[in-house]
Amino acid sequence: MITEAGGEPVHCGVAPDDAAGLQAALARCQNAELILTTGGVSMGEADLMKAALSDGLRFHKVAVQPGKPVALGRLFGKPTFGLPGNPVSCLVTFQQLVRPVIRAMLGLARPFSPVIEAVLTAPIRKRPGRALLARARLHRGDDGAVHATPARSQSSGAMSGMVEADGLVILPLEAGDAAAGEMVRVQVLRWRFMDRAEPGYWREGAEAEAPYGSSAPGSGEDDACC
């Protein structure tokens, strides 16, 4: 994921579940331009990343599912993300938070993945109070519209739905259940569902829409992947 975003990953090892070992592992990362960790950001006794970031902590937890237990701070003067240890939550928070930062640090003008509209083929249950990024498969229907079929399980432990997902259906904080047939916004993860005529396609001179409504100006360079 780091390579696809344009970065160069450097693995600094696995940290033990104790404060001294974690600090030693983090010290090995101090020459990086951006530090990423996975795990240790929730509420367990061994979740030590929040404390490690205490002096430079910017936020801990976001109102998004999956991916609530995520942290951002600074270590050694470098931006540092503490991503959830759950694989699905880690993948989603990387896509939403880390990938745009890497691309912005590289000076790329379109950090966000494109967002399109699609017709929901099955209902998605959701309670207001937290945004939901629901994994879905996309296909183009006989009507020419893109249709989004949500994964059967939206559990953050269901990796199969993430592997098969072509996009993430965006249901905002205040939204409730989404019904079949409803038009929804989808963040595209796989290019084959992008038509060059559709808003959000990263063509020369175009603008890519950010997942939550803001946009980034196009630069004329042609990205190979979203």
Specify the residue positions occupied by each region the protein language model found.
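Phosphate-binding glycine-rich loops and their immediate beta-loop-alpha structural context
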Residues: 1-37, 42
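Loop/helix-junction capping segments adjacent to catalytic residues or to phosphate/diphosphate-binding pockets
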Residues: 19-20, 43, 91, 178
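Residue-level recognition of oxygen-bearing side chains
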Residues: 21, 48, 97
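Glycine-rich beta-strand-to-loop/alpha-helix junction loops that act as flexible
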Residues: 34-53, 57
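Flexible glycine/proline-rich
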Residues: 52-205, 212, 225-226
